[in-house]
Amino acid sequence: MAASLPHPKIVKKHTKKFKRHHSDRYHRVAENWRKQKGIDSVVRRRFRGQISEPTIGYGSNKKTRFMTPSGHKTYLVSNIKDLEVLMMHTKTYAAEIASNVSSKNRVSILARAKALGIKVTNPKGRLALEA
């Protein structure tokens, strides 16, 4: 496996989910975020002690956005042919095997990735354990 290229430190400015106002108070109000539009809304007016709204300031650094902790970006792979794309980019991208790939095909994809020196983010998914 190739080590990733040097990159700035990955900083996640906000890891908690943004919850909808009053979702904790009323069961009928789902937790999925909705922008407050009311003229008197304390959340929209950013009063102290209220929940925070998603804003542009919470965004990640453009260079580290979508990066895994190892420093690679993921590329979805469904078959062995998809791995050929990553041959020249082993320090930047890591393969992620799609969820609809059978366990038989996963074994062959993992073997080919190891031969090419490509990092796989989910190598243990759907593999039968031998007892």
From Swiss-Prot:
Keyword Iron-sulfur: no
Domain of life: Eukaryota
GO terms for MF: structural constituent of ribosome
Single GO biological process annotation from the record: translation
InterPro entries: Ribosomal_eL32 (IPR001515), Ribosomal_eL32_CS (IPR018263), Ribosomal_eL32_sf (IPR036351)
Keywords of the record: Ribonucleoprotein, Ribosomal protein
Example of a GO cellular component annotation carried by this entry: cytosolic large ribosomal subunit
Recorded coiled-coil stretches: none
PANTHER family for this protein: 60S RIBOSOMAL PROTEIN L32 AND DNA-DIRECTED RNA POLYMERASE II, SUBUNIT N, RIBOSOMAL PROTEIN L32
Family designation: Belongs to the eukaryotic ribosomal protein eL32 family.
Listed name of the protein: Large ribosomal subunit protein eL32
Organism (species): Eremothecium gossypii (strain ATCC 10895 / CBS 109.51 / FGSC 9923 / NRRL Y-1056)
Gene label: RPL32
